[in-house]
Amino acid sequence: MNKALIPAIMGLTFAAAVAAEIPITGNVESKCIVTTDANGVYGNPTPSLLSTTQANGGVEPVVRYDVIQADYYKALISVPDVFTESPALNDVVNWSGDVTVGEVSDPLMSAYDNDKRLYNNITEIDLTVAGSTWFKISSEADYGYDKAFPAGQYRSVVTAECIAN
């Protein structure tokens, strides 16, 4: 009788010792893609103003959002509020800017202009329609009070992100 129990006990011991952990992995790719369509250029219509608007000789940057699945993402687009490169400035720069819908792949996306939320220098838009939206960003920098910007290279940056809800 003992001889029959020994193999059974050994079998249970070996079964417990042979346990394994099996990993499960996965990669998630965003269903929202952000692409730069056009870089911006500052025009200098007056000595104290730098502007990306076409009327002022500039070029507005354009960012495209491609949304594969609607209602899961929001766009966060920041307009510049500082130069990342410039000559030394000894006075205040007053910044303004806006984010507007340019082109759309679905007419319902034109509502994004009315539904956006603004805080600090950030525009937040719920991406409620699948497809592509092109956002134009305007930026103006006004230097001091009747002061001319010093000659040199000026650079600022627009940040565009797609955030999962």
Provide a role label for each language-model segment.
Residues M1-A19:
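Gram-negative bacterial Sec-dependent N-terminal signal peptides
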Residues M10-T13, D81, S105-L108, D126:
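N-terminal regions of proteins, emphasizing targeting and processing segments when present
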Residues A16-A17, V99, L108, D113:
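Intrinsically disordered, low-complexity serine/threonine-rich segments
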Residues V18-N94, E124-N165:
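N-terminal small/polar-rich segments of proteins
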Residues V93-V104:
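Short, surface-exposed beta-strand/strand-loop-strand elements in extracellular ectodomains
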Residues P107-T128:
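Extended, solvent-exposed segments with strong compositional bias
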